[in-house]
Amino acid sequence: VKVAIFNIAKILSGDIAAPIATGDTIVLDDAKIVSVGTGGDAADCEVAIDAGGMMAMPGLIDSHVHITFGDYTPRQKTVGFLESYIHGGVTTCISASEVHVPGRPRDPAGVKALAIAARKSFEHYRPGGMRVHAGSVILEPGLVEADFAELAGHGVWLAKAGFGAFATPYDYAPYVAMAKRHGLVTMVHTGGSSIPGSTGIWADHVLKMQPDVSYHVNGGPIAMPDADFPRLVNESDIAMQVCTAGNLRTTLLVAKLLREAGQEQRLLIATDTPTGSGVMPLGMLYTMSHLAALANVEPEIAVAMATGNNAKVYRLNSGVIAAGSDADVVLVDACLGGSQNDALSALKNGDIMGVGAVITAGVPRFVGRSRNTPETMRRAKVAQSRVAQNFSGEAH
């Protein structure tokens, strides 16, 4: 399906180095963005969407989601949570390990099998149109170099430290190194223990492990000591992920430290859900608003922290609005009845943005109304469609 989105007030690029893109029109074809500019021709498009003066941004990337199998979370006994996150503007979820699978295995063969099965289960399954990167191997004692080669051979590219049966968090270090040697993106639980049997992991542990990402560095949900945060900022180049289901005060502290260090590209926004804190379809939007309103982060930079920053660390071809990127686009606006007049001023005010349309893989999933955010001030609409679908989402 070839899709044109026109009449866009502002394009939020997702690129932290250039967060506003020039233009008012985005053209999508064959699941990719083919052009970003001004006054594009919609005549040869199957679908043309009038943004109605709303802003466009890349689909949000939630880089901390506890996937299991299917669109179901045993932790909160909830069906359909991933499809619901689409209505919060989230178009990509990245597994933080399948640790919530009931009775999950703990031996090397079992954790490999779990990661491979999850990876392959979501390879072609897109709940609500969402792209799910599942299959994050839980690092356990006994894994050897050949295991990581096998995992990589099956397409597993994520590894999680923090839930294994190690005597001390320092013991994760050689396992993280093995995973990195085989091309896996490595993440480590940071902060106090989150589930029975896990342990607290602080800055010294993380620095010894040298993962790609310090997961929920603000606490998941319990934070490490304040003195540890400057160490991670100043003694490493590890990406620092802040999560909605964590400590807000330390989220703001992380943002302050990274901004002062000129390292805002290292800050990643995620939710750490579903967990004991629940299911949060709008969690990404809330953390973006917290940073913009309380941490002096420019709202377009907060958008980049939830999109392009995640994409760069996780090596994804999404998270930015640019020709050649994956065609995941969200139309956003201030919510109806509020004090602000556009999406960016809403974030700066501490409000969430309203979601007016979501397109994933170049396919409109709904246009005009989100099931989960308040109504937008302006209304996106399908101006032209040559397919038997109006994408209105009126059933919401």
Show the residue positions of the predicted features:
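Divalent metal-dependent hydrolysis catalytic cores, especially in the metallo-beta-lactamase
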Residues: F81-G110, F122-L139, G153-F166, G183-M187, ...
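Metal-associated gating/positioning segment near the N- to mid-region
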Residues: A42, A51-I116
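Divalent metal-coordination and catalytic microenvironments
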Residues: I8, A31, G53, H64, ...
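C-terminal cap of metal-dependent C-N hydrolases
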Residues: A327-R379
